[in-house]
């Protein structure tokens, strides 16, 4: 590929009126790692997703609200937060197409959960009520500061990128992957057993992380390494 890769970044919702917006941290992280960011508003069907894919060399699934139980094929549980089904549909369509085409993909926070659901895995709708012995995963410190440690699986792409077996990460979630999709492995784990990273086997680049590396780009070398590895694969 000639020139810098163009990376699609899924837009987040900020209201029930379905207004969408880009997140500054994601845009700057892609630019600083050597890519060109392109914000993707919600798509409505596979054809629109295919049109988007003609423009991009990689895809970032961003953080945001909860995934609707409709897409989990479950009844809603106590503790579930605000859902935007339009965004859920869009990101699941984009993710499934990325998996089919082996387009480099990085899922962040909500993004790891979308990746798991789109690939046939499962998530906890609410960690405190479904995983009662968990640590606090919704930090009370500013998002650029690490909140807890995660262990990195040595036989993983994530380890080869970060070159560390333990890192400090921020934590801003109450949902998490509960079932790893077929063809994926767990690549990061919190001390309480919550899955913090998954990756697809034999993929060009397909990693989901539960933390927000884009918010720690200025302070944590492992965040820079993750984005650089992603851009190099695009």
Annotate the PLM regions.
Residues 1-108, 117, 124, 128-161, ...:
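N-terminal beta1-alpha1 cap of cysteine-dependent amidohydrolase-like domains
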Residues 111:
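Active-site helix of classical SDR
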Residues 162-168:
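Catalytic cores of DNA base-excision repair glycosylases
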Residues 171:
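Short basic/aromatic active-site micro-motif
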Residues 207-210:
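Active-site-proximal beta-strand elements of phosphoester/diester hydrolases
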């Amino acid at each position: 590929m000639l020139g810098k890769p163009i990376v699609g970044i899924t837009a987040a919702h900020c209201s029930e009126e379905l207004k969408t917006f880009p997140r500054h941290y994601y845009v700057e992280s892609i630019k600083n790692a050597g890519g060109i960011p392109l914000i993707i508003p919600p798509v409505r069907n596979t054809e629109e997703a295919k049109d988007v894919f003609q423009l991009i060399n990689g895809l970032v699934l961003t953080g945001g609200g909860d995934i609707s139980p409709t897409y989990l094929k479950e009844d809603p549980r106590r503790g579930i937060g605000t859902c935007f089904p339009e965004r859920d549909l869009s990101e699941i369509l984009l993710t499934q197409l990325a998996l089919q085409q082996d387009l480099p993909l990085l899922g962040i926070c909500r993004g790891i959960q979308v990746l798991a659901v789109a690939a046939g895995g499962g998530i906890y709708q609410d960690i405190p009520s479904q995983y009662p012995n968990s640590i606090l995963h919704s930090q009370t410190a500013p998002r650029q500061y690490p909140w807890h440690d995660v262990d990195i699986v040595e036989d993983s792409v994530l380890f080869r990128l970060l070159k560390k077996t333990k890192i400090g990460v921020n934590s801003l979630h109450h949902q998490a992957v509960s079932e790893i999709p077929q063809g994926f492995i767990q690549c990061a784990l919190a001390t309480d057993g919550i899955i913090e990273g998954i990756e697809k086997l034999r993929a060009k680049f397909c990693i989901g992380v539960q933390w927000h590396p884009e918010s720690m780009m200025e302070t944590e070398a492992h965040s820079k390494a993750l984005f650089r590895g992603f851009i190099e694969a695009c």
